[in-house]
Regions:
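Hydrophobic alpha-helical bundle segments that form small-molecule/ligand-binding pockets
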Residues: 93-95, 141-172, 179-183, 202-206
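Helix-turn-helix
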Residues: 29, 37-71, 75
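Alpha-helical DNA-contacting segments of helix-turn-helix folds
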Residues: 73-80, 143
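N-terminal intrinsically disordered/low-complexity leader segments
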Residues: 1-25, 206
Length: 206
């Protein structure tokens, strides 16, 4: 017996697929608009009206996807985190040598401060880090844990511990955030000094 999908179900599926694509595009526009507004103002608390205006959408579209502005900010954080994790994974995956992997990871983090475009995009989060941690402690802890997964295996391969990886991660991110907050672009010598310091710390702990 041939399994024929009723016409109403096929039409409903087609409509849902079309709306899914439309809604995904709207969410992308809202996230990009929020990034744009925050980069322009340096504030992590933009007005909804400014976001929807930049996105070319309506308040109705905004609240169709996000229950609140905080929900959008979490999506913005998650999106930026995903991009950074993908970037660091690609860097670490370009070599099989664990020391080179740790070096590349640290250089990749500091590159966010050395690149003017990346620094401008990250600056609102760098200067409001304490406020974000107070507002979204669980979400920020989860993003930090995800970042650690891109570094910890390489540190362990050098004989270090997960705590060592956490120290390296915290130090690299602190240096990045400090540079971004003060609109300072770390010089190559500073980056390499930080790399040498972190590698020495990992080896000292073994």
């Amino acid at each position: 017996v041939q399994n024929v999908v009723p016409v109403e179900e096929r039409l409903a599926d087609a409509t849902l697929a079309e709306r899914r694509g439309q809604y995904a595009a709207e969410v992308r526009r809202l996230i990009d608009a929020a990034f744009s507004v925050m980069r322009a103002t340096g504030d992590i608390d933009p007005q909804v009206r400014d976001i929807v205006k930049a996105a070319g959408l309506s308040n109705q579209a905004f609240y169709r996807h996000f229950a609140s502005k905080d929900a959008l900010l979490l999506a913005v954080l998650a999106d930026g985190q995903r991009q950074l994790v993908d970037y660091l994974n690609a860097r670490v995956g370009s070599t099989t040598d664990p020391e080179a992997q740790v070096r590349s990871w640290i250089e990749g983090v500091l590159a966010q401060a050395r690149n003017p475009v990346a620094a401008d995009a990250t600056r609102p989060f760098a200067i409001n880090g304490a406020r974000l941690a107070d507002r979204y402690p669980d979400d920020l802890a989860a993003t930090r844990a995800e970042l650690l997964t891109t570094l910890a295996p390489s540190v362990r391969a050098l004989g270090g511990s997960d705590q060592d990886a956490s120290f390296v991660c915290e130090l690299a991110l602190a240096r990045m955030n400090d540079a971004i907050a003060h609109r300072r672009h770390p010089q190559p010598q500073e980056v390499q000094r930080l790399v040498a310091f972190c590698l020495a710390g990992v080896r000292h702990g073994t």
